[in-house]
């Protein structure tokens, strides 16, 4: 799926900000929450976030009768680095391992989507969602059910990205919920995911470059739990996302 052509200028501004001001790490992934961005860049993110193409796509994935509610607190600029899945990759190994982002997939009728919007993809990174492969270019996006979709990323087969190759994306979040559902329920569901994401992020950052025994132990726990949960939920979890 693609954004509207009119949003190309906003993606250009965001990319320029990342290159010139954010100065992403050349070793690990780099994240910046939407609410931490400068006002002009935040405005560009808001323009993308309000894309009619994104809203239409999310409704098609759930129900045209549903409502869509943005979850701004989870939105971020993300600069990826492929570090493999070994111990030295730290918590970055999660991204290249088959995983499910959140633990709330058993809650029926409610879906939190994470939309990955590509700003640039010089690394030829492929996003695999439920065995479907997406090699996205600038302005293209894919929607992932945060709590149910098994997914991971990898570099395209037979391609070796250059040392300075970049992959920048926006991670935008939305709740799709039935029109008959009280908004307070949608807000509570959003808070569950927001708070889980905050805790997970703190653990992720703590184990990004594990050197101490506590960091290595937590890193092992994160990566092991990720694999176990993905297998358990993928095999036993029912489809409860329908509107």
What function would you assign to each model-found segment?
Residues 1-78:
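Non-heme Fe(II)/2-oxoglutarate
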């Amino acid at each position: 799926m693609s954004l509207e052509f009119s949003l190309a200028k906003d993606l250009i501004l965001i990319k320029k900000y990342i290159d010139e001001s954010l100065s992403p790490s050349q070793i690990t992934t780099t994240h910046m929450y939407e609410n931490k961005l400068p006002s002009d860049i935040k405005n560009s993110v808001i323009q993308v976030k309000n894309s009619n193409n994104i809203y239409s796509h999310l409704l098609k994935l759930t129900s045209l009768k549903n409502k869509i509610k943005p979850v701004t607190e989870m939105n971020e600029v993300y600069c990826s680095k492929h570090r493999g899945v070994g111990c030295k990759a730290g918590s970055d190994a999660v991204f290249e391992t088959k995983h499910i982002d959140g633990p709330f997939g058993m809650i029926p009728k409610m879906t939190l989507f994470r939309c990955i919007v590509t700003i640039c993809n010089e690394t030829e990174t492929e996003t695999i969602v439920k065995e479907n492969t997406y090699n996205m270019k600038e302005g293209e996006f894919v929607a992932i059910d945060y709590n149910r979709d098994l997914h991971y990323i990898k570099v395209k087969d037979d391609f070796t990205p250059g040392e300075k190759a970049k992959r920048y994306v926006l991670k935008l979040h939305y709740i799709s919920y039935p029109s008959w559902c009280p908004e307070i329920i949608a807000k509570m569901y959003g808070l569950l995911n927001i708070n889980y994401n905050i805790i997970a992020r703190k653990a992720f950052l703590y184990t990004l470059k594990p050197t101490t025994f506590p960091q290595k132990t937590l890193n092992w726990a994160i990566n092991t739990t990720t694999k176990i949960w993905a297998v358990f939920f993928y095999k036993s979890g029912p489809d409860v996302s329908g509107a």
